Structures are given as structure tokens and as C-alpha cells.
Amino acid sequence: MMLGVYTLLLLWGLATPCLGLLETVGTLARIDKDELGKAIQNSLVGGPILQNVLGTVTSVNQGLLGAGGLLGGGGLLSYGGIFSLVEELSGLKIEELTLPKVSLKLLPGVGVQLNLHTKVSLHGSGPLVGLLQLAAEVNVSSKVALGMSPRGTPILVLKRCSTLLGHISLMSGLLPTPIFGLVEQTLCKVLPGLLCPVVDSVLSVVNELLGATLSLVPLGPLGSVEFTLATLPLISNQYIELDINPIVKSIAGDVIDFPKPRIPVKVPPKEDHTSQVTVPLYLFSTVFGLLQTNGALDLDITPEMVPRNVPLTTTDLAALAPEALGKLPPAQHLLLSLRVTKSPMVLLQNKKATVSIPVTIHVLSSVPQGTPVALFQLNGVMTLNAHLAPSSTKLHISLSLERLSVQLASSFPQPFDASRLEEWLSDVVRAAYMQRLNEHLEVGIPLPKILNVNFANSVVDIIENAVVLTVAP
């Protein structure tokens, strides 16, 4: 079966993407042309777009050439018209529209040329011609401009739709040559006009997907992230680039403005046939900053929270630093109060993600039926390794303790070398603190919806001050 062509020129942008620099703190999305083509193809397969075309002229006696059409109501071929001998031909209607095959080409600085290859089958009947079947090839050329919706989302607007009907074949039935020529001429004027709504419907589906890119994503008890478009889309010969600005808000609705990196992110080149999302350091810092502000990083550790092989008594502490206990008796339970009063620092570089959390540790002795006795206070830094795992909607973070360094801030009995406690404290933190911290991090780093691209199986690349997710269509 020969294929026709829909050609759709999307005037998406008049500039090309910058040379790998993300000047803002935004999320940079690069949509490969294959993803755009797949979105359009899926809109034709899964939706009612093609069925709506079939429903345009399907009534038996109200078809294109039926009553009220070209043969009825004073139509060109109606009784008394030029060719009254076919006055009883009726019900010519679209029975089948071949699923278009989508191909497109990105034109840097111009737009996108989209080709939809299809063929239309029409059926009809009449006493002189019997059962009639026609096949028509179609070439619809449309121009679409990029505008902004009232919500501030990118939207494609159909500006002009011109059509060219290709070869028409008589598959079955009989039509005298003069009549066939007139039918062909009439179809050239009428039939392609019925197919312009296909272009409009495709644009509507794509616009819905583009609109979903800019959305409000909840961050659990921390707040939310609103994705907005920072600039108009840019276009290269392989991808469309969206500079998306993430606006983080607290649970009360206040905009959170944490420090941003001064040096632009150098985004690596995108490989062909892949789509890419760059998640900036700003989002990581903001999530950890919200955790600190909400007190989620603070924890009081009691003996019940650690396994038996992790000691948390004055006896065990005396073996490490006896001078820290003074005159306290052995075998008393210890309490550790961890407080984080400053925002953690997230470091993304050299394919590694680390988080440094400044912490104050108050060590107390639990007195039965009494007020805990403060022993000493430590100032420390927890250095954590971050493991990043993408899903379809977010970038998940899980932390593990690499090291804990402490120094004595104040001591009631007498000063001592606090470094002797680091291994013991590290065991306590791993047993009680890390699980609680990772539970709070289940909110993850939200990802914008990019034409339904699934980043669950994406390749994660940690670069300077950003994380790049790359996925093949």
C-alpha cells in the first residue's frame, strides 16, 4: 500500500541551544526528536483522533456524495446537475484511515518538520457502479506557531493548514472516466479538509504533555516544587531544549531561596537518540535545607534504638574515655542528643555525591526516675555518601555514613581526646540515625514530566554541581 505524507512544520524556536552551559539553577531538559515523534505516534494509536475522522462522513445516506452532500440538496452531482446519471450514488464515506507512520526532522533556528504517512479508504454504492471503493493518498502541510497559555505553559497553535490530495485509485466498482475525474476533483477540494483536524488533534495531545511539564509536585511534609518555564524552548538538529525553573515552597507556601552556585553548570553533550534532564545542585541543597529547618535531622538516641552489639552505657564509655564520666557509676544507660543547627552541604563532583552534616552531640547519662545528667558536648561533622537511583517521577537518595569526626566542645568533668569516641559514635549513628534519615529522604528529588519520558532506567552521571539523567527512547 502506497503511503501519503502529512507534513507539519512546527515553528518552535528561532534560536539554537547554548553551548552546554546552564547559567541558571534550573532543570535543563533536552527532548530528543525521537521522543517527540513517539509522543505524536502514541497520540494517534491510543486516542480517538483517527476514529473521529472516520465518524465525519459515515451516515449511509449522508455521506460525502449522499443526500446533503455532492449528490443531494442541489449538490454538484445532484439531480439536474451535470451528471444526473449517478444521482443514486450515495453513502461514500471514510471507512479506513491507515495509521500514520511518523517521521520528523528538527530544523535549527526554524522549527520541526513532521511527516505523517497515511492512506484513506472510501466506500460507497450505487445502482450503476455497484460497490465502490476508493483509496486516496494525502499530503497535509500545516504551520504551527508557539505561544504561551494563560498558565504560562508552551502551547502549539495551528496557524495554517494547506492540503494536497495525491493519487486516487479506484479499488473496486465502476465509474466512467468523466465521472471519475469529477469525483477526483471534488475529493481534492473536500476530503483533505476533513483531515486537517487530525493535525489539530495531534497538537492538542502534545500540548497536554507539554503542559504537564510545568506542574506542582509535592515534597511530602517538606513543601512542594513548582516547575515553570524560564525561557522559550530552543531547538537544535537533534533535540528541543527546555530551561525549567524549579520554585521550591515550604509547607506554608513560602518560597525557599537557598544559596545558588556562582559558576554555571557545564552540561555534557547529549548523545543522539537520547533524552536528558539535568538536576541542579540547588534542588539537593534545598531538600536538605528543608529537612534541617523542619527539625527532621535532629534525633534523640536511646539504648532501645540500637542493637545489643552497639553498647550505649557508662561502662562502655569508660573503656574509651574514663575521664569523661567523673564519678558516675558503671552500667548506666547513655542518651545521645543529635542536633543539626546549620544546613547540610551537598557536594556533586567527579561522579560522586556526598553530604556533610554539621552536628552537635550532647551525651547524657540516664538516671532512673530522674533528670538525665549532661556529661559533655561534641561538635562534629558527618560525611555521608549519597547513592542516587532514578524512578519515573523522582531521583531517590539513600545515604550511608563514610566517617564521623568530632571534637570536644565542653566537658563537665575534665577535657579529653574526643577522637577516641569516633568509632563508637559511628556505630551508634549507623545503627540508629541513618535509617531515620533515609526515611525522611524518601520524598526524593522530583523530576519534571517530559512528554511521558520514563527515567526509571536512565543512566545517572554526577557532574560538577549537577546530576544528569540520560535515557534512550
From Swiss-Prot:
Q: Could you name the Gene Ontology cellular component terms for this entry?
A: cytoplasm; extracellular region
Q: Which residues form the signal peptide?
A: 1-20
Residues with glycosylation annotation: 139
Tell me the Gene3D superfamilies matching this sequence.
Bactericidal permeability-increasing protein, domain 1, Bactericidal permeability-increasing protein, domain 2
Q: Tell me the disulfide pairings in this chain.
A: 161-196
Q: Which domain of life is it from?
A: Eukaryota
What are the GO MF terms of this UniProt record? lipid binding
SMART domains tied to this protein = BPI1, BPI2
| Keyword terms, alphabetized | Disulfide bond, Glycoprotein, Secreted, Signal
Q: Does the keyword Nucleotide-binding apply?
A: no
Which InterPro entries is this protein grouped with? Bactericidal_perm-incr_a/b_dom, BPI_fold-BPI/LBP, Lipid-bd_serum_glycop_C, Lipid-bd_serum_glycop_N
**Protein's job:** May have the capacity to recognize and bind specific classes of odorants. May act as a carrier molecule, transporting odorants across the mucus layer to access receptor sites. May serve as a primary defense mechanism by recognizing and removing potentially harmful odorants or pathogenic microorganisms from the mucosa or clearing excess odorant from mucus to enable new odorant stimuli to be received.
What is the name listed in the Swiss-Prot or TrEMBL entry for this protein? BPI fold-containing family B member 3
The record lists the organism as: Mus musculus (Mouse)
Gene label: Bpifb3
